């Protein structure tokens, strides 16, 4: 083996450039809002849509489950207590589409609609 051949073997290999450029993480999309018909607006006393299914109590300020599309509470939130009140007092007495209102009973008309 000649000196030239041995020198060629000892040369370091050329530096390789990375094939793939590092990708930036994809931006996280904000959660899509549900349709207005299925939202509850505690301050305005809006109705719950049948798709939402209700099921929330007054402590969380959500919907009542009344026939699958109950009402939302329009009055201010009550102070949390260790005692849980029955949800029926905050829900409409009729399923969605009825004429009764929320707000402590079907006789009061200060709450949301069904």
UniProtKB/Swiss-Prot annotation:
GO BP field: cellular response to calcium ion; cognition; keratinization
Record InterPro entries: LCE (IPR028205)
CC annotations in GO: cornified envelope; cytoplasm; perinuclear region of cytoplasm
Start-end of Low complexity biased regions: 1-10, 88-99
Compositionally biased tracts (Basic residues): 75-86
UniProt KW keywords: Keratinization
Gene Ontology MF terms: identical protein binding
Reported tissue expression: Skin-specific. Expression was readily detected in adult trunk skin, adult arm skin, fetal skin, penal skin, vulva, esophagus and tongue. Not expressed in the cervix, rectum, lung, colon, or placenta.
Induction: By UVB.
Region of interest (Disordered), ranges: 1-21, 75-114
One Pfam family hit: LCE
Family label: Belongs to the LCE family.
Oligomer and partners: Interacts with CYSRT1.
More about this protein: Belongs to the LCE cluster present on 1q21.
Task of the protein: Precursors of the cornified envelope of the stratum corneum.
Name of protein: Late cornified envelope protein 1D
Source organism per UniProt: Homo sapiens (Human)
